[in-house]
Amino acid sequence: MKLHYPLCASLLALAACSPPPPAPPPAPVERPAPPVTPAPPPVLRPSANWPEWPLETGDWVYRRDERGSLALFGATGQNAIVTLRCDTTRRRLYLARAGAGPAERMIVRTSSTLKEFAASPTGATPAYLATEILPTDPILDAMAFSRGRIALEVDGQQPIAIPSWTEITRIVEDCRA
């Protein structure tokens, strides 16, 4: 039995000479989540009966400047939702609606008719989508005499209904004079 003690002692000494255990793996580095870009709100189609759509909140304001006359519709102290401009030099009217995107068409609905126009971004800040209308276009008379409201539908934008007030008639008359 005495022979076993030296052997056991040797084995214990050898066991004590083993390499240290490996270092634990480094803690995972938390990477911040990529910023979440909210999806654009879906364009809700109101009922097909557009005269029942709620009117946008705001008032029409008439102004004159070096280019001609301008009617702006929107809430006081905020950017206009809709503009109608008469460029007296070019003898053109421009109907614009607040919004951005690759719009291709604008539909103007009145109590008597509707008309589709090509629309494009104006490049202005804030962003607007606009169409050019000749002063002799019958849609202008339909807008001026529409029964209480006009609807504007622009690709990629929420359709809106705005009141038909005398400022529209003033802009049309300015461009026809």
Model-derived segments and their meaning:
Residues 85-122:
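Mid-length scaffold segments of soluble, non-membrane domains
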Residues 1-7:
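Bacterial N-terminal signal peptides that target proteins for export
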Residues 13-16:
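C-terminal motif of bacterial Sec signal peptides marking the signal peptidase cleavage site
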Residues 20-22, 117, 121-177:
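Internal interaction segment
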Residues 26-51:
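Post-signal peptide N-terminal segment of mature Sec-exported envelope proteins
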Residues 45-82:
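Transition segment at domain starts
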Residues 67-75, 91-97, 127-133:
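Generic recognition of long tandem-repeat/solenoid scaffolds
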